[in-house]
Amino acid sequence: MYGRVGAVEKSLDFERRRHKYKGKWMCSLSTYNMWWVICVCEYYFMTGAKDFLGKQMGYLAEQIDLFNESVGENGELKYECLYVDWPTMDHEDKIIGSRFINIIAAKKAKELYTRLGLDTAEIDRLLAKLMMSDMKVKEKKQVIGLKYYALGSITDDDYALLIKDGASGLSTFMSYFILGTIASRDKELAIKIMKDYYGAMLDKGATTFWEDFDIEWTIGSGRIDRLPKPGEKDIHGDFGKYCYKGFRHSLCHAWSSGVIKFIEEYCK
């Protein structure tokens, strides 16, 4: 959205150098390597920065090989840790969600290779294996959003789950995918849900994007810019789980900012 940004290039380059050994997952999470591939491809598509891309291509090709090694010939995912986001960490939807992220990464890589005139045979092999699966999502909205961006469509049942209870069940990390998928059928509804979700953050004093947020947290809780009143919940200290329990929950986190891309695409 902003042309070439040095901080973006340095961050992606840093992660490549930090995890340069084949088989080393970023932050021990295989899907982070997939997101790295997606980010590098998208950044090049938006900027045409060939000098930056040239530094990444060797490592990117290694990721394709690594993904192929981690997906069985029958389509089984053999990654050590499957991760979509924290709200799905203990839910079975993280398995199919990780597959969707892998499909998105493979498709972005294929588009990149095609533009550069490179052989896509290994990517095609990876995609063929990844498609050997029942693509059904049980209930998680963020995984339905990933399904749309991986496959290009969702079922009517998927859509019904996606819009059920409006902003309830949204994910900060996957906000772009959830809202974009809703907008593919009902742009105005997607914008309303965005306003309900991020507006609730603003109502609680947010000035930056929060690491995680559940609309239910707003019930009986105070704002972050003052101490809780007697009987109020502390929306910062009393919520969160996994690695961000209590005050470890970041109130300024980039992975919640996907809504900016949604606004740029749908709210002009």
Regions found by a protein language model. Give the residues of each.
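Active-site core of glycosidic bond-cleaving carbohydrate-active enzymes
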Residues: 1-268
